[in-house]
Amino acid sequence: TASSASLPAAYGSVVINEIHYNPATSQGSDNDYEFLELYNMSTSDVDLHGMTVGQVGSTTSIASLDSVTISAGSYVVVAYTGATYSSLTVPVVDNAGYFGLRNDGNALELIDSTGAVVDNVTYDDYYDWPRDPDGGGPSLELIDASSDNNLASSWRGHGISGGTPGAANSAQPDISMGSSITSYQTVSSTATATFQLN
């Protein structure tokens, strides 16, 4: 059993948060606009030195995150062509064309310097997964960073065309509101009460 001291520093803090694997033709080529976004949901900066992100089991389709620090509550964008996203205010990792996201689904993992898996997700373009990110414009966006990102239901794909690289996802958790009547007082035997929630 792993102790807390043996877990990766980023474990439970840094997650794969957004995947733009098949940009719309109107946006441009996959080579220019593909990206993957990491999010640090903790309240502390995380040094990603020695870490990699990429396809599970691949020795070539990976990106090195050396010399990258992800600020608390912020993002890192890993792009096939980093120059496309050079105007972002968050770190952008240019993978010099070696990092690619398959259009028909892929298994991705974030690995620390010891080889331990920090996060992993296997996305797809069919079954329960959102369809629009497969060439329709938006990216796959994690609804809640603390949710299980291997579940299709944890992702949405009907947001902003081109995604939200380096910024909060347009997909947000549904707001649920409960209400209850704690007391009431009748004013006549024929009183009628109407309630409406908007």
Predicted regions and their residues:
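Short edge beta-strand/loop segments characteristic of extracellular beta-sandwich folds
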Residues: 37-39, 194-198
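Short, compositionally biased P/S/T/A/G/V-rich stretches that sit at domain boundaries
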Residues: 169-186
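Short, solvent-exposed loop/linker segments at the N-terminal edge
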Residues: 24-29, 183-192
